[in-house]
Protein backbone atom coordinates (compact mmCIF):
# COMPACT_ATOMS: atom_id res chain seq x y z
CA UNK A 1 0.00 0.00 0.00
CA UNK A 2 2.19 2.78 -1.35
CA UNK A 3 -0.14 5.51 -0.17
CA UNK A 4 0.20 4.45 3.46
CA UNK A 5 3.98 4.13 3.11
CA UNK A 6 4.04 7.77 2.01
CA UNK A 7 1.44 8.98 4.49
CA UNK A 8 3.95 10.91 6.62
CA UNK A 9 5.12 13.00 3.66
CA UNK A 10 1.55 13.54 2.46
CA UNK A 11 0.46 14.57 5.97
CA UNK A 12 3.25 17.12 6.17
CA UNK A 13 2.37 18.66 2.82
CA UNK A 14 -1.32 18.86 3.75
CA UNK A 15 -0.55 20.32 7.17
CA UNK A 16 1.69 23.03 5.72
CA UNK A 17 -0.81 24.12 3.05
CA UNK A 18 -3.35 26.90 3.47
CA UNK A 19 -5.06 26.31 0.13
CA UNK A 20 -5.35 22.89 -1.51
CA UNK A 21 -6.54 22.28 -5.07
CA UNK A 22 -7.61 18.81 -6.24
CA UNK A 23 -7.82 17.82 -9.87
CA UNK A 24 -7.89 14.63 -11.92
CA UNK A 25 -7.71 13.90 -15.65
CA UNK A 26 -9.81 15.40 -18.42
CA UNK A 27 -13.05 13.59 -19.25
CA UNK A 28 -13.71 12.60 -15.66
CA UNK A 29 -14.76 9.03 -14.99
CA UNK A 30 -16.01 7.54 -11.73
CA UNK A 31 -12.53 6.63 -10.49
CA UNK A 32 -11.20 10.13 -11.11
CA UNK A 33 -14.22 11.85 -9.57
CA UNK A 34 -14.65 9.31 -6.76
CA UNK A 35 -11.03 9.57 -5.63
CA UNK A 36 -11.14 13.38 -5.90
CA UNK A 37 -14.26 13.55 -3.75
CA UNK A 38 -12.75 11.09 -1.28
CA UNK A 39 -9.65 13.28 -0.93
CA UNK A 40 -11.86 16.36 -0.64
CA UNK A 41 -13.71 14.76 2.30
CA UNK A 42 -10.41 13.84 3.97
CA UNK A 43 -9.23 17.45 3.69
CA UNK A 44 -12.54 18.88 4.90
CA UNK A 45 -12.38 16.60 7.95
CA UNK A 46 -9.09 18.35 8.73
CA UNK A 47 -10.69 21.78 8.30
CA UNK A 48 -8.58 22.55 5.22
CA UNK A 49 -9.54 25.15 2.64
CA UNK A 50 -9.78 23.06 -0.53
CA UNK A 51 -11.28 23.08 -4.02
CA UNK A 52 -12.08 20.63 -6.78
CA UNK A 53 -10.83 21.90 -10.15
CA UNK A 54 -13.13 20.77 -12.96
CA UNK A 55 -12.98 22.28 -16.45
CA UNK A 56 -14.91 19.59 -18.35
CA UNK A 57 -17.96 21.06 -20.10
CA UNK A 58 -19.66 17.71 -20.62
CA UNK A 59 -19.56 14.54 -18.54
CA UNK A 60 -20.26 10.85 -18.84
CA UNK A 61 -23.62 9.87 -17.37
CA UNK A 62 -22.47 8.70 -13.92
CA UNK A 63 -20.26 11.73 -13.36
CA UNK A 64 -23.05 14.04 -14.47
CA UNK A 65 -25.46 12.42 -11.99
CA UNK A 66 -23.03 12.87 -9.10
CA UNK A 67 -22.18 16.49 -9.87
CA UNK A 68 -25.86 17.34 -10.25
CA UNK A 69 -26.81 15.61 -7.00
CA UNK A 70 -23.93 17.24 -5.09
CA UNK A 71 -24.43 20.70 -6.61
CA UNK A 72 -23.76 23.21 -3.83
CA UNK A 73 -22.16 20.58 -1.55
CA UNK A 74 -18.67 20.78 -3.04
CA UNK A 75 -16.34 23.73 -3.62
CA UNK A 76 -15.84 23.35 -7.38
CA UNK A 77 -13.92 25.91 -9.42
CA UNK A 78 -12.68 26.21 -13.00
CA UNK A 79 -9.18 27.15 -14.14
CA UNK A 80 -10.02 30.83 -14.51
CA UNK A 81 -10.84 31.02 -10.77
CA UNK A 82 -7.65 29.38 -9.48
CA UNK A 83 -5.43 32.46 -9.31
CA UNK A 84 -7.99 34.43 -7.32
CA UNK A 85 -8.19 31.66 -4.73
CA UNK A 86 -4.46 31.10 -4.26
CA UNK A 87 -2.76 31.86 -0.97
CA UNK A 88 -0.51 34.92 -1.34
CA UNK A 89 2.34 32.83 0.05
CA UNK A 90 2.89 30.46 -2.89
CA UNK A 91 4.60 27.93 -0.62
CA UNK A 92 1.27 27.51 1.16
CA UNK A 93 -0.57 26.28 -1.94
CA UNK A 94 -0.78 22.56 -2.70
CA UNK A 95 -2.00 20.82 -5.86
CA UNK A 96 -3.18 17.22 -5.53
CA UNK A 97 -3.35 15.42 -8.88
CA UNK A 98 -5.39 12.22 -8.86
CA UNK A 99 -5.80 9.32 -11.30
CA UNK A 100 -3.27 10.58 -13.81
CA UNK A 101 0.39 11.54 -13.87
CA UNK A 102 0.45 12.92 -17.42
CA UNK A 103 0.71 16.69 -17.92
CA UNK A 104 -1.31 16.59 -21.14
CA UNK A 105 -4.24 14.78 -19.50
CA UNK A 106 -4.93 16.95 -16.45
CA UNK A 107 -8.07 19.03 -16.06
CA UNK A 108 -6.13 22.27 -15.73
CA UNK A 109 -2.76 23.19 -17.21
CA UNK A 110 -3.23 26.51 -15.45
CA UNK A 111 -3.06 24.74 -12.09
CA UNK A 112 0.17 23.02 -13.13
CA UNK A 113 1.74 26.36 -14.04
CA UNK A 114 0.52 28.35 -11.03
CA UNK A 115 1.07 25.87 -8.19
CA UNK A 116 4.66 24.66 -7.73
CA UNK A 117 3.95 22.32 -4.80
CA UNK A 118 2.41 19.17 -6.32
CA UNK A 119 1.55 15.64 -5.21
CA UNK A 120 0.37 12.93 -7.59
CA UNK A 121 -1.73 10.00 -6.34
CA UNK A 122 -2.21 7.50 -9.14
CA UNK A 123 -2.31 3.85 -10.18
CA UNK A 124 -1.20 4.26 -13.80
CA UNK A 125 2.24 3.71 -15.29
CA UNK A 126 4.61 6.60 -15.93
CA UNK A 127 5.86 7.76 -19.33
CA UNK A 128 7.56 10.60 -21.15
CA UNK A 129 4.65 12.97 -20.43
CA UNK A 130 4.68 12.29 -16.68
CA UNK A 131 4.72 15.49 -14.61
CA UNK A 132 8.31 15.93 -13.44
CA UNK A 133 8.07 18.50 -10.64
CA UNK A 134 5.78 16.54 -8.32
CA UNK A 135 6.03 14.11 -5.43
CA UNK A 136 4.51 10.93 -6.85
CA UNK A 137 2.61 8.33 -4.84
CA UNK A 138 2.00 5.63 -7.40
CA UNK A 139 0.87 2.03 -7.08
CA UNK A 140 0.25 0.29 -10.38
CA UNK A 141 -0.62 -2.92 -8.53
CA UNK A 142 -3.72 -1.22 -7.14
CA UNK A 143 -7.01 -1.53 -9.00
CA UNK A 144 -7.90 2.14 -8.92
CA UNK A 145 -7.15 5.49 -7.37
CA UNK A 146 -10.40 5.07 -5.42
CA UNK A 147 -8.88 2.00 -3.75
CA UNK A 148 -5.82 4.05 -2.77
CA UNK A 149 -7.99 6.81 -1.30
CA UNK A 150 -10.11 4.24 0.55
CA UNK A 151 -6.92 3.07 2.29
CA UNK A 152 -6.39 6.64 3.48
CA UNK A 153 -10.00 7.07 4.57
CA UNK A 154 -9.79 3.95 6.72
CA UNK A 155 -6.37 4.85 8.11
CA UNK A 156 -7.51 8.35 9.02
CA UNK A 157 -10.82 6.97 10.38
CA UNK A 158 -12.81 9.48 8.33
CA UNK A 159 -16.56 9.56 8.94
CA UNK A 160 -18.10 9.26 5.49
CA UNK A 161 -21.71 9.72 4.42
CA UNK A 162 -23.05 6.55 2.71
CA UNK A 163 -23.52 8.37 -0.60
CA UNK A 164 -19.87 9.45 -0.69
CA UNK A 165 -18.84 5.88 0.12
CA UNK A 166 -21.04 4.74 -2.78
CA UNK A 167 -19.35 7.18 -5.17
CA UNK A 168 -15.90 5.90 -4.22
CA UNK A 169 -17.03 2.27 -4.52
CA UNK A 170 -18.37 3.00 -8.00
CA UNK A 171 -14.86 4.06 -9.03
CA UNK A 172 -13.46 0.71 -7.91
CA UNK A 173 -16.24 -1.20 -9.68
CA UNK A 174 -15.62 0.77 -12.88
CA UNK A 175 -11.87 0.29 -13.02
CA UNK A 176 -12.02 -3.42 -12.15
CA UNK A 177 -14.86 -4.00 -14.62
CA UNK A 178 -17.03 -5.28 -11.77
CA UNK A 179 -14.11 -7.05 -10.02
CA UNK A 180 -13.00 -9.05 -13.07
CA UNK A 181 -9.74 -7.18 -13.78
CA UNK A 182 -6.78 -6.17 -11.60
CA UNK A 183 -8.58 -7.28 -8.45
CA UNK A 184 -6.71 -8.38 -5.32
CA UNK A 185 -7.63 -9.23 -1.74
CA UNK A 186 -6.95 -5.56 -0.92
CA UNK A 187 -9.47 -4.51 -3.57
CA UNK A 188 -12.16 -6.71 -2.06
CA UNK A 189 -11.30 -5.39 1.38
CA UNK A 190 -11.61 -1.78 0.20
CA UNK A 191 -15.05 -2.62 -1.22
CA UNK A 192 -15.99 -4.30 2.07
CA UNK A 193 -14.82 -1.28 4.05
CA UNK A 194 -16.84 1.14 1.92
CA UNK A 195 -19.85 -1.14 2.30
CA UNK A 196 -19.38 -1.01 6.07
CA UNK A 197 -19.68 2.78 5.77
CA UNK A 198 -23.01 2.36 4.01
CA UNK A 199 -22.05 2.21 0.33
CA UNK A 200 -24.97 0.86 -1.68
CA UNK A 201 -24.39 -1.72 -4.43
CA UNK A 202 -27.77 -0.78 -5.87
CA UNK A 203 -26.79 2.88 -6.14
CA UNK A 204 -23.44 1.90 -7.67
CA UNK A 205 -25.35 0.20 -10.47
CA UNK A 206 -27.42 3.37 -10.88
CA UNK A 207 -24.23 5.41 -11.31
CA UNK A 208 -22.86 2.88 -13.81
CA UNK A 209 -25.94 2.90 -16.04
CA UNK A 210 -25.09 3.79 -19.61
CA UNK A 211 -26.73 5.96 -22.21
CA UNK A 212 -28.43 3.69 -24.77
CA UNK A 213 -27.30 5.68 -27.81
CA UNK A 214 -23.69 5.82 -26.60
CA UNK A 215 -23.74 2.09 -25.84
CA UNK A 216 -25.12 1.32 -29.31
CA UNK A 217 -22.45 3.49 -30.93
CA UNK A 218 -19.73 1.65 -29.03
CA UNK A 219 -21.09 -1.74 -30.02
CA UNK A 220 -20.59 -0.84 -33.69
CA UNK A 221 -16.87 -1.24 -33.07
CA UNK A 222 -17.42 -4.92 -32.28
CA UNK A 223 -18.63 -5.50 -35.84
CA UNK A 224 -15.19 -4.39 -37.07
CA UNK A 225 -13.33 -6.84 -34.85
CA UNK A 226 -10.13 -8.49 -36.05
CA UNK A 227 -8.24 -11.17 -34.11
CA UNK A 228 -4.44 -11.27 -34.39
CA UNK A 229 -2.54 -14.50 -33.61
CA UNK A 230 -5.68 -15.98 -32.05
CA UNK A 231 -5.24 -13.93 -28.87
CA UNK A 232 -5.17 -10.20 -29.65
CA UNK A 233 -8.48 -8.44 -30.30
CA UNK A 234 -8.14 -5.40 -32.55
CA UNK A 235 -10.78 -2.98 -33.75
CA UNK A 236 -10.93 0.52 -35.18
CA UNK A 237 -13.67 3.09 -35.61
CA UNK A 238 -14.60 4.92 -38.77
CA UNK A 239 -13.17 8.40 -39.22
CA UNK A 240 -16.65 9.93 -39.17
CA UNK A 241 -17.35 9.17 -35.49
CA UNK A 242 -15.86 10.96 -32.48
CA UNK A 243 -15.42 8.91 -29.30
CA UNK A 244 -14.44 9.79 -25.75
CA UNK A 245 -11.41 8.12 -24.17
CA UNK A 246 -13.66 6.21 -21.79
CA UNK A 247 -15.71 4.86 -24.73
CA UNK A 248 -12.61 3.31 -26.27
CA UNK A 249 -11.58 1.96 -22.86
CA UNK A 250 -14.96 0.31 -22.33
CA UNK A 251 -14.76 -1.46 -25.68
CA UNK A 252 -11.23 -2.62 -24.87
CA UNK A 253 -12.54 -4.02 -21.57
CA UNK A 254 -15.40 -5.81 -23.33
CA UNK A 255 -13.08 -7.49 -25.84
CA UNK A 256 -11.25 -9.29 -23.03
CA UNK A 257 -14.37 -11.33 -22.31
CA UNK A 258 -14.12 -13.19 -25.62
CA UNK A 259 -12.70 -16.71 -25.57
CA UNK A 260 -8.88 -16.99 -25.97
CA UNK A 261 -8.39 -13.22 -26.05
CA UNK A 262 -5.48 -12.07 -23.87
CA UNK A 263 -5.24 -8.43 -24.93
CA UNK A 264 -7.19 -5.83 -26.88
CA UNK A 265 -6.50 -2.66 -28.86
CA UNK A 266 -9.15 -0.13 -29.85
CA UNK A 267 -8.55 2.86 -32.14
CA UNK A 268 -10.88 5.81 -32.61
CA UNK A 269 -10.98 9.57 -33.15
CA UNK A 270 -11.09 11.70 -29.99
CA UNK A 271 -11.54 14.92 -31.95
CA UNK A 272 -10.96 16.09 -35.51
CA UNK A 273 -7.18 16.21 -35.04
CA UNK A 274 -6.62 13.43 -32.49
CA UNK A 275 -6.71 9.64 -32.70
CA UNK A 276 -6.69 7.63 -29.48
CA UNK A 277 -5.62 4.07 -28.75
CA UNK A 278 -6.92 2.21 -25.71
CA UNK A 279 -5.46 -1.16 -24.76
CA UNK A 280 -6.24 -3.80 -22.16
CA UNK A 281 -4.59 -7.06 -21.11
CA UNK A 282 -5.25 -9.92 -18.72
CA UNK A 283 -1.65 -9.52 -17.61
CA UNK A 284 -0.09 -12.12 -19.90
CA UNK A 285 0.76 -9.72 -22.73
CA UNK A 286 2.99 -6.66 -22.40
CA UNK A 287 0.80 -3.87 -23.76
CA UNK A 288 2.75 -1.17 -21.90
CA UNK A 289 5.88 -1.91 -23.95
CA UNK A 290 3.92 -1.42 -27.18
CA UNK A 291 2.25 1.77 -26.00
CA UNK A 292 5.49 3.28 -24.73
CA UNK A 293 7.07 2.72 -28.15
CA UNK A 294 4.11 4.67 -29.57
CA UNK A 295 4.56 7.57 -27.15
CA UNK A 296 1.93 6.49 -24.64
CA UNK A 297 2.06 4.50 -21.46
CA UNK A 298 0.33 2.13 -19.12
CA UNK A 299 0.95 -1.02 -17.14
CA UNK A 300 0.47 -4.75 -17.65
CA UNK A 301 -3.32 -4.41 -17.53
CA UNK A 302 -4.27 -1.14 -19.25
CA UNK A 303 -2.83 1.73 -21.19
CA UNK A 304 -3.40 4.33 -23.86
CA UNK A 305 -1.75 6.71 -26.28
CA UNK A 306 -2.82 9.55 -28.56
CA UNK A 307 -1.71 10.76 -31.97
CA UNK A 308 -2.07 14.26 -33.39
CA UNK A 309 -2.51 14.94 -37.10
CA UNK A 310 -2.64 11.26 -38.07
CA UNK A 311 -5.44 9.26 -39.66
CA UNK A 312 -6.96 6.14 -38.14
CA UNK A 313 -5.35 4.06 -40.89
CA UNK A 314 -1.92 5.52 -40.13
CA UNK A 315 -2.32 4.80 -36.43
CA UNK A 316 -3.56 1.29 -37.19
CA UNK A 317 -0.39 0.63 -39.18
CA UNK A 318 1.84 1.91 -36.37
CA UNK A 319 0.08 -0.17 -33.71
CA UNK A 320 0.16 -3.35 -35.79
CA UNK A 321 3.84 -2.84 -36.56
CA UNK A 322 4.62 -2.72 -32.84
CA UNK A 323 2.44 -5.76 -32.16
CA UNK A 324 4.28 -7.66 -34.89
CA UNK A 325 7.66 -6.64 -33.49
CA UNK A 326 6.71 -7.79 -30.01
CA UNK A 327 5.34 -11.07 -31.31
CA UNK A 328 8.65 -11.64 -33.10
CA UNK A 329 10.76 -11.07 -29.99
Give the residues covered by each predicted segment.
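An acidic intrinsically disordered interaction segment
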Residues: 1-10, 111-119, 140-145, 149
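Hydrophobic helix-and-loop "lid/oligomerization" segment in the mid-to-C-terminal part
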Residues: 2-27, 34-73, 84-94, 174-329
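A generic local secondary-structure boundary/capping motif
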Residues: 11, 83-86, 107-110, 136-138, ...
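Short, acidic Gly/Pro/Ser/Thr-rich loop/turn segments
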Residues: 29, 103-105, 126-128, 179, ...
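Acidic active-site catalytic centers that drive phospho-/nucleotidyl reactions
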Residues: 29-31, 99, 122, 175
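Glycine-rich, phosphate-binding/catalytic loops in enzymes
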Residues: 39-40, 112-115, 137, 190
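Active-site cofactor/cluster-binding pocket
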Residues: 77-135
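Short alpha-helices
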Residues: 121-191
Amino acid sequence: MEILKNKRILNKKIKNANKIFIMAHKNLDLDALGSSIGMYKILKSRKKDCYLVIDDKTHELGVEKILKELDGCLDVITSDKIEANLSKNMKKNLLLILDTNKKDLVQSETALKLIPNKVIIDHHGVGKNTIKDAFIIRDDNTSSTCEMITNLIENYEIELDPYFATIILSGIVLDTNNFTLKTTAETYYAAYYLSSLGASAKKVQYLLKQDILEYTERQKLLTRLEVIDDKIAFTKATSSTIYRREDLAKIADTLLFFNNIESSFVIGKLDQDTVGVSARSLGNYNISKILEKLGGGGDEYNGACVFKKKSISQVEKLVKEQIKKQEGE
